[in-house]
Amino acid sequence: NEDGEVKKADMFYKQTIKAKTVIDRVETAVEALNVSVNEFGYVNLAYMLSIYEPDITNAKEELAEKSGQTVDEITLSDDALAELRRAVLVEELDGLIFLNPDRYNENNPDIGWETADEYLSGNVRDKLRVAKAMAADTGNPQAEKFAGNVAALEKVQPEWIEASDIDVKIGTTWIEPLDYEQFIYELLNTPRRARAVRSQFYNTGIQVHLNKMSMEWFIENKSMDKHSVAATKTYGTSRMDAYSIFEDTLNLKTVTVRDRIDDGDGKYHYEVNKNETMLAREKQNMIKEKFKEWLFSEPERRQKYVEYYNETFNNIRLREYDGSHLQFPGMNPAIELKPHQKNAVARILLGGNTLLAHCVGAGKSFEMMAACMEQKRLGLANKTIMVVPKPLIGQTASEFLRLYPSANILVATERDFEKSRRKQFVSRIATGDYDCIIMSHSQFEKIPISAERKERMLNEQIDEISYAIDEMKERNGERWTVKQMESQKKKLEEQLKSLSDESRKDDLITFEELGVDSIMVDEAHNFKNLAIFSKMNNVSGISSSGAKKSTDMQLKCQYLSEINDGRGIVFATGTPISNTMCEMYVMQLYLQKAALEEMGIYHFDSWAANFGEVTTALELTVEGSGFRFKSRFNKFTNLPELMNIFREVADVQTADMLNLPVPQAEYINEVLKPSETQEEMVSSFADRAEAVRNGNVNPRFDNMLKITNDGRKLALDQRLINPLLPDFEDSKLNACVDAMFETWERGSEKRLTQLFFCDL
């Protein structure tokens, strides 16, 4: 210990490692199934038959009856006997295991079996389609077995959602462009001369198009009917016609009308025309409401889109994971995981990528450690890196060895990632056989993803954008859109050239060369700052700038999902969604990108059109001097379906669900009056903010962030703005000191302790 005293370790007095129990015989088929799942993580018929002897008496009697022989006269070859034993075992487990048609192999009858909770979950609509096709194949020897699948799957289909419960907004990408065209024609009574004409010789008329690369909608030739009464008065304004409003709405934008203000000397700036903007937004809301009424009004169109929505988004049955059968050989027997922890481990082992969205104190660290050891034992993962915040490396390592005393772990120290030692340490990861490698977030980022993977990603983006540019030019798309895409293409090409010219730093082994096939990321919310590219601009909650470490994490997650078919990634955080709705999309992008793409969601705007909504409301200005309109992406739509998709990867456990022993907090809000100096300074903030909005000040000298920060400092104590100002007796700081002193006096007899937090 710290005093230099030596004593015998716990292993001298008690068992510190749970021995592995070897089971060589069970009495029932169900027991054999449980042991198989515990030992291998799946239904292993060959293993089950090695520990369980099914009673084949009745089966032999049926054979005798069919052949006209007695039971004693029947002789079976070894292969025939093995097949009979397998058939009896499968029959005994009828309803508990199913043969998955997607994994079925007619040459190996042991392959493709799944437990009921696995097979009867996930995309059950797609599974039902496949099962029906296989059951209808009369030439398939397993057709009867697949008919049983059909019956079981039909019982677990999600309840059909009717049109009245589906929220479809303008801009939803699975609504066909021709239907958007038809809507605007009917709404504005577009004259026939201005309607679309498509032929192999020419295209003309007002047409709605979707750029598949940028997912940007544009209306071609909208000027052909921009002066009609419907376009300029009923559903539009003199400053913004209905076609332009509809185009902005398709692109999820809140319409804004701006006036050009001349500053002299050939300079000018734009200011929002509040009255015209309010009028245009009123027309925009009218168009939105009319679209909702129109979309499902025609029976054939209603059936088409209701079926699409149910087949695409309402197709999931969530799986209930039960970890009660797990034995955890090698774990410290003095530690017993709680039921929710065992279930979380089962989810990681039996499911795919996982988000442990558990509250503080739920035991996420032990869940990841146990899952790490179990997936190594079961052969589900060969090498796992556990990524934790830098201050927690030592604690994580000691907790790991407390849970698994004989674990072979490699722990990265600060010295290991110094430039002179980094290559040696990374080589140890590549060449060693470790149960787990523990390192910090920043150290993980220093292990490079291969230049080839980065180049491939950039080339794919360049190819996509080149195709989109060609498509736009063929359709005579708007020049600003083409120019914008060409600028984006140029930036990508510069990145590609920079990547080609850059020599690999330290000549390190790349992430792909390490042999790592699993990562577990603690405090994963630190990687939520991933760049989101969206057509929506000036909308709070959407950021197009991202952190480098988040991009690095995304590339590594994509690699692991590719080699593991959607597994191998575990994120753990108590705050998966804390600031904006976009954080849910980011988590889905890390963990279930392929699932989103199966639904046709390749971009954030597609996700936002299905599951979110931008709201505009009056809000107090940053400087607190008045109100202004603010657009925020802050409202969920079609939430039940979104949560079903999200819960496929997310294991959510709140403090209320776990009934954790957390004491009730008493919140006290102190209301204080400002000093005269503070009031004067708040007024000056309004002038500063107006100057920033109008672009009259260099952002290096003043900006909204600086004004906000000055406001926070002023609210705490005016001397934080100017140390020469007097100490205001009723300041927040003084009120806090008085409260702390009063609390200290009350607890001085018992020598109680206070914790004080200040976010400045």
Regions found by a protein language model. Give the residues of each.
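Charged, low-complexity intrinsically disordered regions
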Residues: 1-315, 381, 405, 429, ...
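Conserved pre-motif I regulatory segment
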Residues: 315-357
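Hydrophobic anchor at the beta1->P-loop junction of P-loop NTPases
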Residues: 356, 386, 572
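Conserved SF1/SF2 helicase motif Ia
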Residues: 360-362, 367-398, 404-408, 563-568
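Conserved helix-turn-beta segment of the N-terminal RecA-like "Helicase ATP-binding" lobe
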Residues: 391-418, 424, 428-431, 591-595
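Inter-lobe coupling linker of SF2 helicases/translocases
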Residues: 422-469, 474-476, 480, 487-518, ...
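Walker B catalytic acidic pair
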Residues: 522-523
